[in-house]
Amino acid sequence: MKYLSLVAVLLLLVSCNKNGVAQKPIKTELDSVSYAIGMDVAKNVKASFDDFDNDLFIQGFTNALDSTDILLDEAEAQKVVRAYFQKKQQEEMAKRQEEAKANKEAGEKFLAENKTKDGVQTTESGLQYIVLKEGTGEKPTTASKVKVHYHGTLIDGTVFDSSVDRGEPTEFGVTQVIKGWTEGLQLMKEGAKYKFFIPSDIAYGANPRPGGKIKANAALIFDVELLEIVK
């Protein structure tokens, strides 16, 4: 496990006494490297496991280093840590599943209400769109590369990506994007501007990019202007 490997490294690098961490001045290059590695590994441990009891954490280091006053043998320690992280993983998975379910329901409710509004058209896939401005050029195909401006938001208005805000259009292949975009772009002519309301199953579904504003099963809204069919 990641946590256990980090602890193993720490046990080799960190020197503690029973009153806390020993304070030593940095005198040599090796001192600096040792201290820097200790800082880096400690940050990684905190990022992986931030709710530990600091005193017992240090006590565990100290006991393992000098092999005295051991409260848990190695097998028991591994069993405890493994069980704890399995439980945390299950709790996190359950939380993500609940959030994904709530996002799905919120998106479906939004789209059900949105489809009844003036100007909203719905395709067989569930993609909804409004024509903000019709174009006069050609329509792209799945073989096309296009240049577009876009502004993407969640259904609550949160902006997650925008070439408009960046002030620079972007280019990509029609099939190199989410399914809702691939379908929607082929409805447009060069020069057109549409607003797309995209169900989660033709957006990023249950597996959006990690760490982003788009969460699992989120419905998305895009203002898209098709500037040019590049090829």
Describe every region a protein language model picked out:
Residues 1-14:
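Sec-dependent bacterial lipoprotein signal peptides
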Residues 3, 16-231:
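Cross-family detector of peptidyl-prolyl cis-trans isomerase
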